[in-house]
From Swiss-Prot:
Belongs to the peroxiredoxin family. Prx6 subfamily. Transmembrane segments: none annotated. It comes from the Eukaryota. Keywords: Antioxidant, Cytoplasm, Nucleus, Oxidoreductase, Peroxidase, Redox-active center. It is an enzyme of class 1 (oxidoreductase). GO terms for molecular function: peroxidase activity; thioredoxin-dependent peroxiredoxin activity. The active site is at 46 (cysteine sulfenic acid (-soh) intermediate). It is found in: Nucleus; Cytoplasm. Residues 4-164 form the Thioredoxin domain. The gene is PER1. This is 1-Cys peroxiredoxin PER1. It comes from Triticum aestivum (Wheat). Its EC number is 1.11.1.24.
Length: 218
């Protein structure tokens, strides 16, 4: 069966967490949620990642985005491990919930399984991160192996891109950062673009002369 991917609705699972029972759709509500998995508690890369998430929590909060972690460890393990996370990065308070999936059924439904990483109980979660929108659908996914920690600056940049695209009906080019030019979707005619973007736009002069690469500011 194909795994959860961009455009799919996230299963409305209910799981125990460090903040009590959580039903995913209720947690998403009318906003955006970063739903991320880690292979295991009390492991080195995961400790640095969840500390980084805690460090960046205010950046996500400013954008109206909530965090939600998950792994196959139990709630008590998550709570004990949180002490290590916060000690590793003093000032990094883990305020977001971490869900428990001891039977690993949720990580399978969320397409968060690492086929190459196992323990005595079975396959472990990968470093998967889904950005879920208000419609409960996956807007973007990152998938990393256990050996590679995530880059939080790129997660923030991806969130900014999604929010900008949703608000202004544009797309963001390679290496884009907030404040830089965005591109106009090819389905928008020049006449429509003039109405949508009264500030104007520039069309790149390319050999094909197709006029499809148009930049504007929002």
């Amino acid at each position: 069966m194909p795994g959860l991917t961009i455009g799919d609705t996230v299963p409305n699972l209910e799981l125990d967490s460090t903040h009590g029972k959580i039903r995913i759709h209720d947690y998403v509500g009318n906003g955006y949620v970063i739903l991320f998995s880690h292979p295991g508690d009390f492991t080195p890369v995961c400790t640095t990642e969840l500390a980084a998430m805690a460090n960046y929590a205010k950046e996500f909060e400013k954008r109206g985005v909530k965090l939600l972690g998950i792994s196959c460890d139990d709630v008590q393990s998550h709570k004990e491990w949180t002490k290590d996370i916060e000690a590793y990065k003093p000032g990094s308070k883990v305020t977001y919930p971490i869900m428990a999936d001891p039977d690993r059924s949720a990580i399978k439904q969320l397409n968060m399984v690492d086929p190459d990483e196992k323990d005595a109980e079975g396959q472990l979660p990968s470093r998967t991160l889904h950005i879920v929108g208000p419609d409960k659908k996956v807007k973007l996914s990152f998938l990393y192996p256990s050996c590679t920690g995530r880059n939080m600056d790129e997660v923030v940049r991806a969130v900014d891109s999604l929010l900008t695209a949703a608000k202004h009906k544009v797309a963001t080019p390679a290496n884009w950062n907030p404040g830089e030019c965005v591109v106009i979707a090819p389905g928008v005619s020049d006449d429509e673009a003039k109405k949508m973007f009264p500030q104007g736009f520039e069309t790149a002069d390319l050999p094909s002369k197709k006029g499809y690469l148009r930049f504007t500011k929002v």
